[in-house]
Amino acid sequence: MFEMFPNFWTPVLPIAEIGTDPVAVELAGESLVLFCNSAGQFAALLDRCPHRGAPLSRGQVTEDGCLECPYHGWQFATDGACTRVPFNSLNPTQLSKFSVVSFPTRVIAGMLWIFTGTENVSELQLPSSLLEADDRYVIHHEIWNAHWTRAIDISLDYLHIPVVHRNSFGAELNDIAHKDAICASQQRFAIAQISITATADGMTVTNRLNTLPSGIEIDWHQPNNVVLNLDGMPLLPHFFAIPINAQQMRFMQVILPNPGVDRNSFNFDDFFAASLDDRTMIESQIGEVPNTTEGCHVPTDEPSLRFRRWYYRTVKKQSIETIQGTSVN
């Protein structure tokens, strides 16, 4: 289960989009159903009734907070336990054999988080910027036709900004790049200064050009979160690349405005629109990021290369072990 993204915590959807009507989502190749009962408890279940395999997302949430299958009316609690089978007299022991698979959930930063596994649930490590009240965050998400690793790869790449974002916030860096082309013969051109500090759950990458007074700090938190610290920006953006399947991902932007920012007057849409440049680029690439032994690399690629090494040593390794374990059993 979750072979392409096993045993990780990840946000799935904003809680504002999950109510008492069941919501069908795909996460890392698995079909899930999300819902919230009248007591405010969120749940994530496998979207398949154990009786006849009907999608539970086509059912309804009952008054007592259970999810009812649309086929025969079987009911399931938020923990997946079967609570009712109509027209049958079953004792608790019999009902316990009819549970649907459920997954651990948390509500953090206005999002529903799911652990992509059912055993050995790890602690959820988060940057302090994601521990504010739920209503502090502005959330936007889109489905992109790309592997999730491509979004992390480009988010860690400082030097894509002057080219991919030349018509938006990368214009200044693009001007510098063009001046470099003119001055290259005189050996007077900007040099990227990139330093990497390993952290408990990823890395911090400090980026700047030697001709500019300021730069960008990028924090990567395993597995799929990148936080950008831009000098002078009145907000803190968190990017999540959430795998849907091998061909699609949900790109979620979670914005924490600085105290004092007027949320009604700040143009968040313009900020979100800048990611469309990234979307166009990574949707033109095929599959997951290649291993570090493939392709050509230069010193400024090191942040992306570190992510790729981690991905192949950790996520891909788990994926292979999960597949092998399934085939053996």
Map each language-model feature to its residues.
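Rieske [2Fe-2S] iron-sulfur-binding domain
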Residues: 11-136, 329
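A boundary/linker detector
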Residues: 1-6
